[in-house]
Amino acid sequence: MGKGNEDPDLHCSSIQCSTDQPPFQQISFTEKGSDEKKPFKGKGKTAFSHSSEKHTQRQAGSDPNPNKENSEETKLKAGNSTAGSEPESSSYQENCRKRKISSKDICQDRAGNCPEEECNLTLNKKSRSSTAVHNSEIQETCDAHHRGSSRACTGRSKRHRSRALEVQTPSLRKSLVTSVRAMSEAVYQDLAQVWAQQIHSPLTCEQLTLLTRLRGPLCAQVQTLYSMATQAAYVFPAESWLVPATLPGPGDSALDREAHPFPGQEITEPVSGSDEAKLGAP
């Protein structure tokens, strides 16, 4: 009966040990004495606790916490990545800057500006071109209006000038022609008076020669002046009294000169006493 009572306790203790201890440290001994069994239980517990502590220490010493290791590794990796990414980022930024600068230089060398600047320039050029076209159209319209007005003004001024010339030039020409004709008429009258005086008081041969020498150039000058006046007048016809008769040459005698008087001069011959007696006789 004693054995029968001891068996369930042993089984319970073995079950408890199996639940408390890991599977590889399950140790069960079946002894007959209850007194011997109790100290064994305490020893087993202490041994189990010591073994579990040693096992945990070994695990702590040999196998550290994987989460901590992973966190430390991630921190180290992050530090390395940040430490490596900082120079990489700085070098990348420098490369980007160099590329931008080189692209700007290339764009400036080729086209003078970069695409962004080209877009801005194209927009500015378009706006400027539109404003320039608008201004040019306005200027063209203003110029056309100004030209039309200037043409109208010039046409009016030309018409006014032509009318003024038509009004003024005849008076000037008329005064010029009349003055020249009056001068030529006066010269001819002087010549006629000289020849009339020669009849009443005959001149010497020297005076006659000088008179004939003066007569030729004077008549020529008068004729040229009159012809010029006629050409200037365009309208006034030549007067009949200005057309001179054939002038005698320098070798002609006084009788021939008397036979060819100037136009408008009357022939007056001196009458002798015998002729008067003949005329007075019945």
UniProtKB/Swiss-Prot annotation:
Domain of life of the source: Eukaryota
Polar residues composition bias: residue spans: 13-31, 58-68, 79-94
GO CC entries: nucleus
Keyword field contains Metal-binding: no
Region feature Disordered, mapped onto this chain: 1-96, 249-282
Record Pfam families: FRG2 (PF15315)
Major location category of this protein: nucleus
Entry protein name: Protein FRG2-like-2
Organism: Homo sapiens (Human)
